Amino acid sequence: TLEELSPENCLFFDIETTGLSWKTSHLYLLGAVFYENETWIHRQWFCQKPGEEKEVLLAFSELLSTKKLLFHYNGTTFDVPYLMHKYTFYQLPAPWEGTRQLDLYQLFFPLKKILHLKHMRQKDLENATGLFREDLYSGGELIEVYKKYLLSGDEHLLEILCLHNKEDVEGMLKLLPLFSIRTLWTGNCQEFITCTHTVEGNLLLSVQPEHPFPVSFEKKLPHVVLRITPQKLLLEIRPEAGCKKFFYSNYKDYYYLPIEDEAIHKSVGAYVDKDHREKATPDNCCKKVNGCFYPQYEELSLRLSGMSVRKKTAGFFCRKILMKIRNNF
């Protein structure tokens, strides 16, 4: 709901641990970003020793109790299960009951192909949107840094540990503009679409985003070119001229005329010589249609094909493209 999405109800978090198994490792750092007094606040809880885990968990529970929406990046796979086991171990109630969770990794995964990403690490998405970190370490590499800090107390090592976590949680907040791209196939953007034609006769759909796109890129498919800039999306669609076949679903009500290679309704076909007609079948109960056709990337109830059998690559008329654009990209 809109109330849930208000900044005051949102909490972004990330954890750092000494290993992947909650049984053989411990939580050493938990970072969170939240909105308070009209500003975003970053807070961290650091464990100098394993015995301080419980205090960190209690502090996180207290903060989360005031929020309704919990953001994390791939936390469904690691952060949340890890913390759940820790809360159980310390006989503490789970803090996220009644709190909705949004995993940005799962929500943004469809962007991997569009943005030409090899991996879907948070850093990969950040780099694609022009964000670059000071932190040079991975979470795994920081385990040794943490151990060295415990032995030496070197404040520089502590800064390295805190910087990595800080950029993780603040990075999630900076990735939120990517939702403007995701809404192309999950939201209703038709009200922002204008339709024109190029000199060559190509259909040109222009989408003015409600919020600016955080990236610019171009993607080409057969017959289609997609161009995205911060202020506009342009979809240029090249039609294919030719003859297609429109298939009728109620083929039992039709006769097939072999010479014409198309079907006519029995109410009319009754006047055709019996030697020039036959009962229609699902594969020949059709009518030839001449015109310009636009590409179709999923099967519709409207059956148009350049072949005498149904195919998912069939074309469909221009009026259908606006209904399907958000699902095709």
Predicted segments, located by residue:
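DEDD superfamily 3′-5′ metal-dependent exonuclease/proofreading module
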Residues: 1-13, 20-25, 35-329
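Short beta-strand scaffold segments in enzyme catalytic cores
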Residues: 30-32
